[in-house]
Amino acid sequence: MPLAVKRIANLGQHKAIVTLGVIIKGDTPHFDFVAGECARGIADVTLEYDLPIGFGVLTVNNVDQALARAEEGEANKGREAALAALEMADLLERLS
């Protein structure tokens, strides 16, 4: 995901990006590595391109938890990530 986000950021056509995905924990520590590197990579792109990126990547124990966080309404984590990215883009514009 970080590579795809970097390619989009490199286009220079967006004021913000929103990442959406889910990482479901299995029986090995692989989950921790994938989740951590995904977050770190996206944070690196944010700082490299000075571009707000809403982090809507869910880290859950099972599919039911993912579905609960993706339901319509105020608690939707994708919605929260999009709003955070838009608010940060607005703040950065006001600070420039």
Task: Map each language-model feature to its residues.
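Short glycine/serine/threonine-rich phosphate/pyrophosphate-binding segments
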Residues: 1-2, 66
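C-terminal binding/interaction regions
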Residues: 36-96
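Glycine-rich phosphate-binding loop
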Residues: 3-42
